[in-house]
Structures are given as C-alpha cells and as structure tokens.
Amino acid sequence: MTWRKATARMVWACIAAGGLAAALGGCASSSSNGNWRQSGAQGVGKGDIVTQSDENEVRKRARIRLELASTYFTQAQYTTALDEIKQALAIDPTLVSAVELRALIYDAMGDQARAEDAFKQALSMEPNNAGVLHNYGWYLCRHKEFARADPLFVQAANQPMSLTATKSLLVRGVCQIQAGQWAEAEKSLAKSYELDPANPATAYNLSAVLFHKGEFERARFYIRRVNASSQQATAESLWLATRIEHKLDNPTVRDEFGAQLRNRFAGSREANLFELGRFDE
C-alpha cells in the first residue's frame, strides 16, 4: 500500500464529522453545526450565528425534514433520504444545508454528475459556506481533481467563525499527499496541528509526510502522540511507529511496537508485514 492510500485510509477513520455528513465516516464536514443561516431567521444581527430559537415556523418544518433525511443518509437509505430532501426544499427552497446533503447523497450513490451539480447549486446560494466549500473540496479530491479542490479548502479554512478550519487544513494536506505535493502537505498539516494538536489524524498524516521525507526523529514525535492513547492507536499508526524505529536502527523499541501490533491487530495487513520483516511496504 502506498503512503497516499494509507494516509487517506487513516484520515477517513479518524476525523470526527458531525451533523449532516456523519455517515461519510471522516472527511466531510457539516455546514450547519446547528447554524441555520439562510433566510427565514428572525431577530439576528449581522454576523451572528443563527440558532434554532431564531427559526420561524417554515424553517423549523424544513429543518425537521432535513434531520430525517440526515438520519436516512446515515443508514444508507439514500432514496428515502432524497425524498425527505425534496420535501424540505419544497417547504423552504433557501435551505442550503438541504442542497448540500443532496450532493452528499448523490455522491454516496455514485452519481457524480448530480452530486457536482448540487454542490455548485449550494455554493451559488451561499458562496462562503465553509462546510459546503469543505465537502465540495473533499468530493473533488476523491475524484483526483486536486487543482480544483485546493482553493476550496483554502477558502473554507479562511472563513470567519468557521468551525471547519482544522478539518479543511487536514484534508487539504491529505489531498496534497495524494497529488504527490509533499512539501505543501507538510505545511497544511503543520498548520492544522497548530490549531488542534489533539487530532490523531493530523498527527498521523504529518508523521507520514515526515517519514516520506526521511525526517524520522520528527516523524517519531508526532506518531508517539497518536500511539500514547490506546483508544487512538490503530494498526496503521503502530505500523508507522514500527517502521520509524526500524529506520532509526532501534530494534528494541521497534519490536515493542510490533508486539502491540501483533497482539492488538492480529491478522491485519500491518501485523503480517511485521512478521515478514517487510518494513519498506
């Protein structure tokens, strides 16, 4: 497995995503975060975050449909989710979050044309919506449209009051890895780490980049942050630590990580590679 595939797998597993896109298991981000910012809110000053108490009855009914759609989406009941989206938009056509979720559903169904159209529609309705920018960028990245994805992540991370900045920087770094842009990936991941040093996906991917660059001592620092918690450690993170110690000619520590890998993730690809001594894969 190449580092590009391994880092993508790790980032999908580790990024906590809430709200609309929880079912994506990782890199997607909710544009709502409880923030219903479309027309229909009352009593809100410019620049305020709109909360549910600001909703009028029309928006509230649409939101209920949207929440149902999100639930069906997480259960992979995509046709039913789309039907709820249609009803939400029939109630309130200005609900950007519903259009965004429609894009995510079409993407999950493998309908790229409709997914992209929905993302474009959502951005035309709200060009600076950080969640939409992030999710559209990740969609493009997964389809190897790296040049188109990158500015969307930058724009998402730069939005004022954005709750997605660290995720957008992280996923931007992962996309840059997949594009072979290692120096740029290090910068994006380092910035994400500065903002959220507790995120294990950021630490793992940054360590992976540094390993690729041959900076093994620095790589060791970040991967230790991940493996220090048994709840965060994965077969991938323990294998990376094992490989780092092998490169540093530290067989005792290498074998300690290998033992953890064998005991906790027996039968995994990484455990098998350790048993075979294939540290360059």
PLM regions: where:
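TPR alpha-solenoid repeat register
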Residues: 98, 132, 166-168, 202, ...
